[in-house]
Curated annotation (Swiss-Prot):
The keyword Iron-sulfur does not apply. This is Large ribosomal subunit protein uL29. Signal peptide: none annotated. Belongs to the universal ribosomal protein uL29 family. Keywords: Ribonucleoprotein, Ribosomal protein. GO terms for cellular component: cytosolic large ribosomal subunit. Pfam families: Ribosomal_L29. One of its GO terms (molecular function) is structural constituent of ribosome. It comes from Proteus mirabilis (strain HI4320). The lineage of its organism: Bacteria, Pseudomonadati, Pseudomonadota, Gammaproteobacteria, Enterobacterales.
Amino acid sequence: MKAKELREKSVEELNTELLNLLREQFNLRMQAASGQLQQSHLLKQVRRNIARVKTLLTEKAGA
């Protein structure tokens, strides 16, 4: 997910996206803990996407 795509979304859409990413991160962490996760790079991608969304929410709150 690109930051440019996220900047076009509204605050409500960003909050929804954040919830989806947090759920996905939880599921990936559970898979990793049980040894079922084959693509460990997804954890890093999701973590960075969460940071992108949170950063944009902070920017929009200040503006």
